[in-house]
Amino acid sequence: MATTIPFDFRSHCVQLLAQAVKQVLPEETEIHIELQRPKQMDHGDYSTNLAMKLAKRLRRNPLELAKVLIGALPDSPYVGKTVVAGGGFVNFFLKKTAKQQFLLTVLQAADSFGHSKLGAGKTIQIEFVSANPTGPLHVGHGRGAAFGASLANIMAAAGYAVTREFYVNDAGRQMDILALSTWLRYLDLCGIALPFPSNAYQGRYVVDMALEIHRIHGDRYAHYSDSPTQQLAEINAKAAADGEDEYLDNLITAAKSILGEDYAYLHNFVLTEQLNDCRNDLMEFGVEFENWFSEQSLFDSGMVARAVQLLDDKKLLYRQDGALWFQSTGFGDEKDRVVQRENGQYTYFASDIAYHLSKYERGFDYMLNIWGADHHGYISRVKGAIEALSLDSDKLEIALVQFAVLYRDGNKISMSTRSGEFVTLRQLRQEVGNDAARFFYVLRKSDQHLDFDLDLAKSQSNDNPVYYVQYAHARICSVLEQWGGAVDIFGRAETELLTNPAELVLLQKIIDFPDTIEAAAKEHAPHLIAFFLRELASEFHSYYNSTRFLIPDEALKIARLALISAVCQVLSKGLSLLGVTSPRKM
């Protein structure tokens, strides 16, 4: 009767070690066993420094303890031998037959191969992108989108129940600035030319929204009993005496006064236009969310007032200069923070406290915020507020994503969001394609700067990592198409014929795939999947260039085709986790 091969050899070896420790060191009831993949294949398949760690604590010789542990290891149908190496490492060597037979398990598992029960069904909310709906998404947002979407896929594959959330900043000053910017462009279309503030939104999309409003409503929002020309001219006349922010705020106040109830229409129009554009852009990029959470809803529901009241009930607020301050220095922040201004308006920080209170009250087991690196200073105050509310701050993690710098012809492309001089995510996607954008964005750790070479991303060469990986997939599909047989036969493949060193390397890479997904989930590191795919593609291309597949020896042919079919399956799964397609032809 055939033995069922476990999906996870690593876990099997960990269990063997745990049983050995229980036998020879029964007093060691709390141990953490880690296995690493040795850098050199001749050092085994897995290695652990457990004996060295235990020896240090128990004041024993690590080499002797390693030998004792090996002697206590139960027999295994999958482990060929274990040896002591170096200063006390225990190295495991899997049986060649175990690796060969594992291939059949991979093929049988199909798309579920690589999945694990790491998350055990626990819920995790991943909030990412959350860009202000004040203009098109730019390439910086694109990196956060690719990172967040890929990580969400990886966490789901690792057994977590994932909720993807976009926090819509639809309340506050930035939306007012966009509404004002659009109205001023609209007035210009109506023949009312007024100075346009340098710190208003400058992009072409503002003019486009003004044109759409004018197309629908004509001059309706230009003629009021209170003349826009007179009021705004008075504000412009003393603009030099005011600071830029005060000048802009005065214009916003005047716009609200002049437009009256019509201001709400203008505000909602620009919000809807930009939010729809954002949704469509992300959807085309393969990034979707279960929930779009409105900041304004926190005010409408009274959640902001309730969050502030909870802090007040804990006597953690005080008044100074007419404003209400949170004693955040008592919770690790560098200074106390205002939650309510002198004019009674709540600050952005107050709504952020309420938003995180909402997350906790929704009952997620874990929460992950993915923020731009420019929000680094915001972490301590948010964590402080969570602790002040007596919530478990360990449930919340915050990952930072550095900006992506674009290069064309070796030259850096300069960008400025407010002035409208930036490359949008849509422009990037149109130039290099979704696949290249998604893959390139996760080639580095999220907290590392990313240099995005547009020319490389468009090239069809082995230097282009996404092309290199996709080409491996297409090559395999081509071989299988030339063969033209039924893949069901692979389940009866004589895998013991796969003895070529290149074949054993490919088998080992396939075995590593579930471990790679788990590591990427634990470390919040999609780049580990990208690295793995490049390595697997490289090993396959070498194998392809040195091996014939459609050969007279039927048994060996089927075994080799089964192997590359499994490689194809893993490449496709890995690419899908990163939101990248797997073309059958290139």
Swiss-Prot record:
UniProt EC number: 6.1.1.19
One of the protein's GO biological processes: arginyl-tRNA aminoacylation
GO annotation, cellular component aspect: cytoplasm
Subcellular location: Cytoplasm
Keywords annotated in UniProt: Aminoacyl-tRNA synthetase, ATP-binding, Cytoplasm, Ligase, Nucleotide-binding, Protein biosynthesis
Motif 'HIGH' region per record, residues: 131-141
Catalysed reactions, as listed in the record: tRNA(Arg) + L-arginine + ATP = L-arginyl-tRNA(Arg) + AMP + diphosphate
Gene3D superfamilies assigned: Arginyl tRNA synthetase N-terminal domain (3.30.1360.70), HUPs (3.40.50.620), Isoleucyl-tRNA Synthetase, Domain 1 (1.10.730.10)
Origin: domain of life: Bacteria
Major location category of this protein: cytoplasm
Pfam family name, one: DALR_1
GO MF: arginine-tRNA ligase activity; ATP binding
Keyword Transferase found: no
Keyword ATP-binding: yes
Membership in a protein family: Belongs to the class-I aminoacyl-tRNA synthetase family.
Assembly information from the UniProt record: Monomer.
Name the UniProt record assigns to this protein: Arginine--tRNA ligase
Organism: Nitrosomonas eutropha (strain DSM 101675 / C91 / Nm57)
